[in-house]
């Protein structure tokens, strides 16, 4: 009971923001003109007529590199705050971070062995 009172302002803020978001999207949908034509279905390339097809299929290796990048980017996001507050947590936090890094290294080795990082 007392715990919920502490968050009353947050819930009111959340309701107000939700209401205004729905209101703004509804108004823009209602007020905006609907233009249907062939120009809507073409891609925009800096004012120049598009050359070739707009939808091309990328090779899977681009996605694999992007996936590995995202994994290690997320690792950096988690490790930076841990490194900044390392002295406050103690040895248990250090062991947990080592386990986290070990799991990511195992994933990197797995991707490397499967050839996901090869460009040929």
Curated annotation (Swiss-Prot):
From the Swiss-Prot or TrEMBL record, what is one GO molecular function term? Answer: quinone binding
Indicate yes or no for the key word Thylakoid.
Answer: yes
Give EC number(s), comma-separated.
7.1.1.-
Q: Pfam families of this UniProt entry?
A: Oxidored_q4
This protein's major location comes to: plastid
Taxonomically, the superkingdom here is Eukaryota
**Compartment(s):** Plastid, Chloroplast thylakoid membrane
UniProt membrane topology term: Multi-pass membrane protein
Catalytic activities: a plastoquinone + NADH + (n+1) H(+)(in) = a plastoquinol + NAD(+) + n H(+)(out); a plastoquinone + NADPH + (n+1) H(+)(in) = a plastoquinol + NADP(+) + n H(+)(out)
Under InterPro entries, the record lists: NAD(P)H_OxRDtase_bac/plastid (IPR023043), NADH_UbQ/plastoQ_OxRdtase_su3 (IPR000440), NDAH_ubi_oxred_su3_sf (IPR038430)
Q: What class of enzyme is it?
A: translocase
Q: What GO biological process terms are annotated to this protein in UniProt? A: photosynthesis, light reaction
Residue spans crossing the bilayer: 7-27, 64-84, 89-109
Q: Which UniProt keywords apply?
A: Chloroplast, Membrane, NAD, NADP, Plastid, Plastoquinone, Quinone, Thylakoid, Translocase, Transmembrane, Transmembrane helix, Transport
Q: Does the keyword Plastid apply?
A: yes
Which is a Gene Ontology cellular component entry for this protein? chloroplast thylakoid membrane
Q: How does it assemble?
A: NDH is composed of at least 16 different subunits, 5 of which are encoded in the nucleus.
Q: What does this protein do?
A: NDH shuttles electrons from NAD(P)H:plastoquinone, via FMN and iron-sulfur (Fe-S) centers, to quinones in the photosynthetic chain and possibly in a chloroplast respiratory chain. The immediate electron acceptor for the enzyme in this species is believed to be plastoquinone. Couples the redox reaction to proton translocation, and thus conserves the redox energy in a proton gradient.
The record ties this protein, via HAMAP family, to: NDH1_NuoA
Q: Which family does it belong to?
A: Belongs to the complex I subunit 3 family.
User: What name does the UniProt record give this protein?
Assistant: NAD(P)H-quinone oxidoreductase subunit 3, chloroplastic
Phylogenetic lineage:
Eukaryota, Viridiplantae, Streptophyta, Embryophyta, Marchantiophyta
Gene that produces this protein? ndhC
